[in-house]
Amino acid sequence: VRIDIWSDIVCPFCYIGGRHLQLALERFDHAEEVEVVWRSFELDPRPVEDPHADLTEQLAAKYGMSRDQAEANQQRVGEAMEAVGLEFNWRDAHPANTFDAHRLAHLAAERGLSDQAQTAFKKAYFTDGRAIGDHQVLRDLAIGIGLDADEVDDVLSSDRYADQVRADESQAQVYGITAVPTFVLADQYSVSGAQPVDTLVDVLDQVWSLTEKTPLVPVSGAAGESCGVDGCD
């Protein structure tokens, strides 16, 4: 079973949802037969005017709430992260454009380092307060998970993997995905939001039962003559 996850690096519930899925897979009997594919989604594709701006203040303005309300929301998100072993130092977080991070995530996926990239980028943003749109920060993180420095430089100095990012976003539009995280299982079953671990375990069991290939059951007792790879009889 393949699970495609539409996610953005700066989405806190994507971070939580990814952790919930990891915990759910630890309880799923067929986890070794699950392939997780991270897909790109930009919550705000616009260029960041001030990468050092106060994220909480920006969120307050965006959603028409007071500073106190925005801080309370950030605190609740931080508590939700803490409950699953993640850390959100929201006072140190700043706005970021994630397009280049997504491009590097596609490189990482090609090199078998997809999960490592997702974890490194999200931890850098949420826990360490690093500027995830900055090329030097991205370079350090990408090399840190084992990507080749020259290849990382080539990506950051070009538009390599831009088409793959846009293709993911176009597919999200086809599916009608407007919020993340969104999990698409076996190309036809979707789950939206950072669902509880128990819910994800149930979903995995249900999708497995619907897609599992079972042996054919003969409807007659006698076998007629036939040909196989070793000849006819």
Residue ranges and their predicted role:
Residues 18-125, 227, 232:
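Structural alpha/beta surface segment adjacent to cysteine/selenocysteine redox centers
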Residues 10-13, 66, 70, 161, ...:
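Residue-level preference for long, well-ordered alpha-helices that form the structural scaffold
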Residues 1-12, 17-21, 36-39:
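Short active-site neighborhood of thiol/selenol oxidoreductases, capturing the structured segment around
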Residues 5-6, 16-30, 106, 110-233:
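C-terminal cap of thioredoxin/glutaredoxin-like
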Residues 1, 50-51, 64-68, 141-146, ...:
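A broad, low-specificity signal for short, low-complexity segments enriched in glycine/proline
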Residues 12-13, 96, 191:
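Glycine-/small-residue-rich active-site loops that bind phosphorylated ligands and cofactors
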